[in-house]
Structure formats: C-alpha cells, structure tokens
C-alpha cells in the first residue's frame, strides 16, 4: 500500500484551513452532511437524464453513527459514491471540489442545486479527527476503495469490500485536551443539536440511532435502554412551501421554534424572488422590544442559508441598522461563498438581496400603518425610536425612506399622528411644522412657550424622546414645510407684532432689559419682551441650531463638554410681574436683581434645567415672603 502526497501545498494549506477558515469546530458535521447531500443529488440528476433509472426517495438518506467506546464517528450516505480516480482527484487535491466540477458540466434542473462549491469542506473533518477514512463505491461500479489520511503528510488508497454504492466517512475522534472537549462530538444530544442547527433543511433524511428507555418486560418498575432509528432533520423548510398552504399558526410556530422571541410576531413577510438574484425569505416584525435591543450587546441580522444549509447565524449585512429589529431567514442558491461556508463574501448578490429586503420591510410597515393602525402604533411604541435613529444616522441619508413611518403625539389629538396627517390639516397661513420638546406630553402641555402657537390655532407636535429633535434636525423639512421649535427666537407667525409687543414697547423697556441682561451676564444672550407668552410671566427661548433640549441630552452623555445653547429670557410685559420689575428698576436696584434672578431660575426649572445655586434660590424666595 503506497502513501501518496497531496497535490497542493498540503501542510500549509491544511493548517491554514483548520486554524483560520473555520472558527467553530462543530461545522465539520455540517460540511460532511452537505457533501453527502451533494452525492445523492448527483444520483437524482442521473435519473433526470437516463430513462432507465428511477429515483426512489426512500432509498436515499444520510446516517450518522456514534461509537463512544471506540471514539469513532461515521457519516454514511447512499449517494453516487466515488471511483478510485475520483477519490484521488477530489480528496487528494485540497481546494478542489467535485461538486463544483459537476455543477459546471451539467445543468441542474427542477430546483435541485449542488451545495458544495469548494473542496475544503471535507477537510474540516481534521478539526475533530487526526485519522480520517473514506470508504466509497461508485454508482454502477463493482469495485470499492478505502481512502485514509492522518494529516497533511499524505494519504493512501486501497481496494476494499462494500456491498452498496455510496460513501462512508469514518472519523477517529481526537482525545480531549486542556483547551478542547472532543467527547461532545460523540454524544447523541450534541450531534442531534448540530444537525438541527445547521442541516435541518437538507432535503434528504438524516438518520441516527437514538438511545431510549422502556420498562422491562419481567419487571415494569425497572427500565432498560434500547436504540431506535429516527430522522433528525425537518427536510422541507417552511420558506419553500407554498404560501397558500400555510396558516398564520404555521408562521407563529416557526417563530417560536427559532426562539426569535417570547411574543407573537406583529407581522410576517414570506417572499420568493426570482430575477437577477433568486432567494426565499421569511421575515418577522416583533411585537415587543428584546430586553437588550437598545444595548451594545444586541446583534442584528438574519439567518442566512445557501440551499438549505445554514451559512451564518446572524448576517448583519442583510439588514440596515434602522430595521435591526426584524428577525427571520434568507435562503439563496445564488450566493458566492468563499472557501468556507462560514464567511460570506460581500458580493453583489448579497447587496441585491439586502436592498430588496429593505424595500419589502418598508412597504410592509407602510401597509401596516395604513391598514392596521392599532398594530402599527403598538409596533411603533417598541421600535419607533430605532426608526428615528435611522433618520438621524448617516447624516440623514435615510430620511426619504423613513420619514413617512414617523409618528408623534400632538396638541390636536391624544394619539400619535404622522407628518403627512399633520401637514394635510395645516391652515393656509401656517408656514412651519411646530414642535415642542419635553419629558412627557403633560409637561409639554404646560410649557409657557406653547401658548402663542396654540392661540393661533396651530397644531404642535410633542417630542418626548431624546432622539426626536436630533432626527428632525436631519429631516429639516417635510413636503417643503420646515420644522420650527416653539422655543425658537422667531416663531414666524404672521401678525405677531401687532397682537403682542409693539416696537415702541421694546424701545420703552430697552434700559430695563439691558439691566436684566447685565445681571444675568454670561447666562443669557438677551432679555426681551415676549411675543408668545399669554398667561405665564417668563420663559426661555433659544437662538441658533442648538436647542435647550439638545443641550440637556448632550450634557447627559459621558465625557460631555458642558455644551450650552444660546438662551434668551423672554418677559411677558402684560403680566403683573412685569409691573413689579419696572417698579424695582425705577426705585430699588437690589430688588431688581432679586426679581431677575428669581425669574431666570423659574425659567430654568420650567425647562427642566438645574439651578446653579439652589440655596441662593430658596433664600431669595424667603426674602420675598418676609
């Protein structure tokens, strides 16, 4: 028996493959089962081109057998088998794939696709074994051969006995080390779990003899073990079934089986696409937020299959971050894989699938909003924040995709409204989309700044999420209507000059406001008569792009830089408090300072900002009460 050398740079390549390409040892079983499936596919293909042959499905299967005592694991199939020449060509050359060659030479028909595209899958056996034997008998041949290798040094091929055609791969499992427990690859439970995880949708039965117990015949109180053959895999994936044959319950059961969440999905999308790229997908929109969704630990992504074989547990490239809440699977035969099924190339097919999926999700959410408003609002309570992050991120490049999905509470109704609904009912004289920012709807309703806008009969959107205003700054406008905060220095309301403070009033109180500005030096940019206040004596407005609420959010972040918005103290000159200010200005400068500090701190409290010196503030209140 002659030992032959591998025809590639065997040692270096084999070491590279074992140590670098595959990051999880358990995938060896996935690779070997996929090869077995390919071998049966080749038999099926022959029956399509040879009328004298018949394909009896029950005759074709894959068997996994564990022998713990001898530390042997066997994977057998009833596939096409290999001749001596094929054993040498396919297994003697690392990185040569018989499946790939077969695929090139033959046109695969009727939805059957050869899974294997590269020749290193078989060599993943060396992840768990340092003694690999292959016994194979080719279809239509009377001769069988045994191929054996103990690593990169080479291999042997010799004749052997085998009754039926097909292939057996026999692995002598490695002994345990301090770093690795190889015993688990002989355990029934582990093997069954790996098959379910990676190969559940291989289209041929994967069988195992499972250990079970039953009462002894002579003593029912005692139990004995016995073996029973079971098919481990489901074979037909739900996404390849006819949608008309499936019920909502089938999708909900699949959602639960895949452990996508403890809730029921609020919506599912089952799609089959044929075109430039072909794929099947089932996508789920959850009802509730996963506990870790808004943390760094959360990992987005869809399960990615190639011809029913799991390639990646979470393929993040298939989902944009703003749709990261979507769960589900994608299965495609068009994906280009590199030499391991674990790592996917960032190729054109994947990008096309991702683009298509993004559009599908967007359309489904828009449909949900229009046709099932209650469901959409429930979804939005859980994931609306993520959509707003999507608008804000990437410098607003996704705003056109997401803007019609946004919702906010408003002064008009006690429920959420869309931007389209807001704009559709704007009065003709209203130039802007007005919004107010606060911790809650109740707090916003009490804001002094909102009075002037509401008095004009204009609707105000309520921003209660810290991301809201940042997202709107990126959105900039909606249907050519700009957004305007009720705290803006200029509200852009027609006729506000006539209805409130006249220019003569501003001139008359100029010296008073200058004195108050000096008292608050460094704290406010200006003090002026308010054009928005009706019932309240004072409020803070802001000038520039940075609002007071944005200041609060940014300063609450780690490593804040003490960012400050440009604030303006606005005084209601029609309020009784203003009379007290004028009297103090004319007769008691100390009292003017006292009143000014009190009003400024009052305005800070209304905005939810911290008072610089609470003790001084309380002392000032006590002075007034004496």
From Swiss-Prot:
Compartments where found: Cytoplasm
GO molecular-function term, one example from the UniProt record: ATP hydrolysis activity
One Pfam assignment: HATPase_c_3
Domain of life: Bacteria
Keywords: ATP-binding, Chaperone, Cytoplasm, Nucleotide-binding, Stress response
Location of region: Disordered: 490-509
Location of the region described as C in the Swiss-Prot/TrEMBL record: 553-626
Region (A): 1-341
Record has Cell membrane as a keyword: no
Basic and acidic residues biased stretches: 498-509
Region span, B: 342-552
Transmembrane segment boundaries: none
Major location (coarse): cytoplasm
Gene Ontology cellular-component annotations: cytoplasm
Role description: Molecular chaperone. Has ATPase activity.
Family note: Belongs to the heat shock protein 90 family.
Subunit structure: Homodimer.
The name this protein goes by in its record: Chaperone protein HtpG
Protein species of origin: Clostridium botulinum (strain Langeland / NCTC 10281 / Type F)
């Amino acid at each position: 028996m002659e030992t032959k050398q591998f025809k590639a740079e065997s040692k270096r390549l084999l070491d590279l493959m074992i140590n670098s390409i595959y990051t999880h040892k358990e995938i060896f079983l996935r690779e070997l089962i996929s090869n077995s499936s390919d071998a049966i596919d080749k038999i099926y293909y022959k029956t399509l081109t040879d009328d004298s042959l018949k394909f009896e499905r029950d005759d074709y299967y894959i068997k996994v057998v564990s022998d713990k005592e001898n530390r042997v694991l066997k994977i057998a199939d009833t596939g096409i088998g290999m001749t001596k020449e094929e054993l040498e060509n396919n297994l003697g050359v690392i990185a040569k794939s018989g499946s790939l060659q077969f695929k090139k030479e033959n046109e695969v028909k009727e939805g059957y696709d050869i899974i294997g595209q590269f020749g290193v899958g078989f060599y993943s056996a060396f992840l768990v074994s340092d003694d690999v034997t292959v016994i194979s008998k080719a279809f239509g041949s009377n001769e069988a051969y045994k191929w054996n290798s103990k690593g990169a040094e080479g291999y042997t091929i010799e004749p052997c006995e085998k009754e039926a055609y097909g292939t057996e791969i026999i692995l002598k499992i490695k002994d345990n080390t301090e770093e690795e427990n190889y015993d688990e690859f002989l355990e029934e439970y582990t093997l069954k779990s790996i098959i379910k995880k990676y190969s559940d949708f291989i289209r041929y039965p994967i069988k195992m003899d499972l250990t079970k117990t039953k009462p002894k015949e002579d003593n029912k109180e005692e139990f004995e073990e016995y073996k029973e053959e079971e098919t481990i895999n489901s074979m037909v994936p739900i996404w390849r079934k006819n949608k008309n044959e499936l019920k909502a319950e089938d999708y909900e059961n699949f959602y639960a089986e895949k452990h996508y969440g403890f809730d029921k999905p609020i919506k599912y999308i089952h799609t089959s696409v044929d075109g430039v790229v072909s794929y099947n997908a089932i996508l789920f929109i959850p009802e509730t937020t996963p506990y870790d969704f808004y943390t760094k630990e959360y990992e987005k992504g869809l399960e990615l299959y190639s011809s029913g074989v799991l390639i990646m547990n979470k393929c993040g490239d298939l989902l944009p971050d703003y749709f990261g809440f979507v769960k589900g699977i994608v299965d495609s035969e068009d994906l280009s894989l590199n030499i391991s099924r674990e790592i996917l190339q960032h190729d054109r097919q994947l990008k096309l699938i991702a683009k298509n999926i993004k559009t599908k999700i967007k359309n489904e959410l828009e449909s949900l909003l229009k046709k099932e408003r209650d469901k959409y609002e429930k979804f939005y309570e859980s994931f609306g924040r993520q959509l707003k992050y999507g608008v804000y991120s990437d410098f607003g490049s996704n705003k056109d995709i997401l803007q019609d999905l946004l919702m906010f509470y408003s002064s008009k109704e006690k429920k959420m409204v869309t931007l389209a609904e807001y704009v559709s009912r704007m009065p003709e004289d209203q130039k802007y989309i007005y919004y107010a920012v606060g911790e809650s709807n109740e707090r916003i309703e009490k804001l002094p700044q909102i009075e002037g806008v509401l008095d004009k009969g204009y609707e105000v959107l309520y921003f209660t999420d810290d991301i809201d205003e940042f997202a709107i700054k990126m959105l900039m406008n909606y249907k050519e209507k700009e957004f305007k905060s009720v705290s803006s220095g200029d509200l852009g309301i027609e006729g506000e000059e006539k209805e409130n403070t006249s220019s003569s009033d501003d001139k008359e109180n100029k010296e008073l406001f200058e004195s108050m500005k000096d008292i608050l030096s460094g704290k406010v940019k200006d003090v002026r008569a308010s054009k928005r206040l009706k019932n309240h004596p004072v409020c803070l407005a802001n000038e520039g792009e940075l609002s007071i609420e944005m200041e609060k959010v940014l300063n609450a972040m780690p490593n804040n830089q003490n960012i400050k918005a440009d604030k303006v103290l606005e005084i209601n000159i029609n309020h009784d408090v203003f009379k007290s200010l004028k009297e103090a200005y004319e007769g008691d400068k100390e009292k003017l300072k006292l009143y000014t500090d009190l009003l400024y701190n009052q305005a800070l409290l209304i905005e939810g900002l911290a008072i610089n010196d609470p003790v001084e503030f309380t002392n000032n209140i006590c002075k007034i009460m004496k």
